[in-house]
Amino acid sequence: LGLVGSEMCIRDRVMRHPNPGAGEFLAQHVDASIVNAGDGAHEHPTQALLDAFSIREALGTLKGTKVAIIGDIVHSRVALSNVLLLKKMGAEVMVCGPTTLVPKHMHTLGVRIEHNLQTAIEWCDVANMLRVQHERQDINHFPSIAEYRAQYGLTMDHLDALEKPIVIMHPGPINRGVEITSEVADSKHSVILDQVQNGVAIRMAVLYLLAEKRKLNNGK
């Protein structure tokens, strides 16, 4: 990838890789801009950008907004990128999931940690639901899908019991009927389709800014 890309004068590269830090490693060895499209269970920066944009679009601001990231935190590259960006933009962040799926180091990032779904959604303005990533698990982190659904699956009954409406997000793909029901995903509370649309614009903007920066640097 590095040598061939250099010979073809490719200046911008979008890279998804199963190993954490792969994009940073490549950036140190090629004369090109690397867009990290996800490196293992580490980070997914452009997803965080589109999520932050979608929240601001829905609520008007990020500062002071309470965002709960709920689900499989330990295997999610979306979670860490969201935490880092949202905190930087002034949002309050909570992570919620089974004790086996929430990394113990999360408290060092200045986020709240919760293990009860109802408590999390009563606290937040935005609930970002994450899927269970079976492909990254080498052991069972909970008894069964049915047990996970019962404890952490978001339903309309949960939302109807709230005193105030909240915004529902999901980075996709959705396991409908597991972490979120179809009724919730397709409800007026959901901005999931807006996230998809905003993702195109955000990633176009990233590539545009890289190209403009190169122009300012005399094409390098």
Residue ranges and their predicted role:
Residues 33-38, 113, 191-194:
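Short hydrophobic/aromatic-enriched beta-strand-loop microsegments
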Residues 29-31, 89, 107-109, 162-164, ...:
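Short, structured coil segments at secondary-structure junctions
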Residues 165-166, 171-220:
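Adenosine-phosphate binding glycine-rich loop
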